Amino acid sequence: MFDFKAQLKILPNEPGVYLMKNSLGEIIYVGKAKILKNRVRQYFQNSKNHSEKVKAMVKNVAEFEYIVTDSEMEALILECNLIKKYSPKYNISLKDDKFYPFIKVTTNEDFPRVFITRNYAKDGNKYFGPYPNAGDVHETINLIRKIFPLRTCKKSIIEGEKPTRACLNYHIKKCNAPCEGRISKTEYKKMIDEIMEVLSGKDRSLLNKLKEEMQSASGNLEFEKAASLRDKMIAIENIAEKQKVFKSQENDEDFINIYKDEKDCCIQVFFLRDGKITGREHFMIENSSHEEDTTIISQFIISFYGGTPKVPKNIYIPESDEIEALEEFLSIKRGSRVFVKVPIKGEKKEMLELVKNNAKVTLDQFKDKILRDKEINMISLKEIQELLELDSIPLRIEAYDISNIQGVDSVGSMIVFENGKAKNSDYRRFRIKTVKSANDYDSMREILDRRFTHGLKEIEEIQNKEIKFSSGKFSNFPDLIMMDGGKGQVNIALEVLEKLGIDIPVCGLVKDDYHATRGIIYNNNELIINRNSNLMQMIRRIQDEVHRFAITYHRSLRDKRTLHSILDDIPNIGQKRRMSLLMKFGSIDNIKKATLDELLETESIDTKAANSVLEYFRNTK
């Protein structure tokens, strides 16, 4: 038994993070404190000033732990990391956490690649960005690839090593084929240097050079070359124009503000570069009204700027009691001093008010849409409750489907709709194990039996406290099961449930001659549904989703089988050689056409293995 009185007495007078746990040992809240002793004790003393959510949380606390940190900044960072890791019930969830895209140049490779990434790492490569507008960065990459014939493959290409066959990009003049040794490392580097000059905003010297080349070509009557150089200059100017917006300057400023209603909040960020608003972002945080603005903003700043080294010099916020800790964290990220400021009056204060007003508008729009969607979804769920005469509204619906081609790679899928919305985290896939032929009924019997048997086992383990409720993947049973098939599949489901002693209503979908759903089969009766009703719209969403999920899984299994099964049958070709052949030739058809010499050029393929490949395809023609 946890001794609260004793543990509260020994809390340290130091900064740190505390973790509240329920009777199942689950972490339900994570918080930080400048002084752990003072902060944690507040929860278990006078509760008059506590919000309803805090009161509810404290009622569920069975024990607590704490971690002492060296500084307030460390506590701030650790709190955010633990919230992300455990997603505690009573913490706000920054679900819209996002990292902006960078352009990465892999300068640590002999023949560097240039591509978009959202993962910044100190790996010796060159990064440009971040770009708040993803559309702009994609346009920039497209322009770069249009004027510079760069490689886009992930091959490890080292100058002087054995060349490999070039891909299609070389033949359509989009790559200079360093893999075949058609361009030297030095020549390729010149191209990369030009790209990095443009991305760094140092485009003027390159444009002057291209202008001279264009005039020379024109003077020599090489009009096609001159036109090509002109197009290249225009593209570079377009890229350079975009880069000006994202180039980090000493006067870069971000303005962050928050607007809350009785339940949710919206954080809005305005990006100012050279005194102009160059972009903005919003982040919706549901069920967060109980948290103080300062707490939400601090957690947001740690999360938002945690994934990028490109932190502005000045960040303006409405209020904070953790400015020193935030400045320390942000300065480390930037590599130079960052100032977090709370303006009292003047232009900066007015800008923060503008940001807050925009946050309010965004939240209102968001709530309007959410309310409309919730209202429509609830109408649909009430319609199906009335249609099937259910005791309660089916807030959780599970739908099942089988996918196969002539009995091969049979797979089952389970999708979940909660409150009329898809809940992707609860989707499950089943690879059929016991059914060898194309038998949808037996396949459906197998996946339903596996799903609910596993669910019953988890429920027992939860009751015995062997696992936590949140760890159960199948323990949450539906209020309604929806079979994509008709009466036959419904009967299979009822048979499985009866065998397991589970009472859940099951309905099936009735199709017309064009395979479009026209109604529901329930208790052996066909119930027609108005094709324009909210209920029919929801059923179609469920049906489309279960089809998509099943077919996607089936396709991935089929592609793996098609790609590897033929090579699996060739003597002397193991996994390593199989991968080498596929890496070199790209497809089974190309391997079939390969000569002995071409096969011997492949890594790890000796004469014996090459002859085995030739012999196999000769005998299977």
Curated annotation (Swiss-Prot):
Main localisation: cytoplasm
PROSITE patterns: GIY_YIG, UVR, UVRC
Domain GIY-YIG, residue spans: 13-92
Residue ranges of every copy of the UVR domain listed in the record: 204-239
Signal peptide feature range: none
Localization per record: Cytoplasm
GO terms, molecular function: DNA binding; excinuclease ABC activity
Keywords: Cytoplasm, DNA damage, DNA excision, DNA repair, Excision nuclease, SOS response
InterPro entries the UniProt entry points to: DisA/LigA_HHH (IPR041663), GIY-YIG_endonuc (IPR000305), GIY-YIG_endonuc_sf (IPR035901), GIY-YIG_UvrC_Cho (IPR047296), RuvA_2-like (IPR010994), UVR_dom (IPR001943), UVR_dom_sf (IPR036876), UvrABC_protein_C (IPR050066)
Gene3D superfamilies: 5' to 3' exonuclease, C-terminal subdomain, GIY-YIG endonuclease, UVR domain, UvrC, RNAse H endonuclease domain
SMART domains: GIYc
Any single GO CC term annotated in Swiss-Prot or TrEMBL for this entry: excinuclease repair complex
A Pfam family hit: UVR
UniProt GO BP: nucleotide-excision repair; SOS response
Known role: The UvrABC repair system catalyzes the recognition and processing of DNA lesions. UvrC both incises the 5' and 3' sides of the lesion. The N-terminal half is responsible for the 3' incision and the C-terminal half is responsible for the 5' incision.
Family: Belongs to the UvrC family.
Complex and partners: Interacts with UvrB in an incision complex.
Protein name: UvrABC system protein C
Taxonomic source organism: Clostridium beijerinckii (strain ATCC 51743 / NCIMB 8052)
Gene coding for it: uvrC
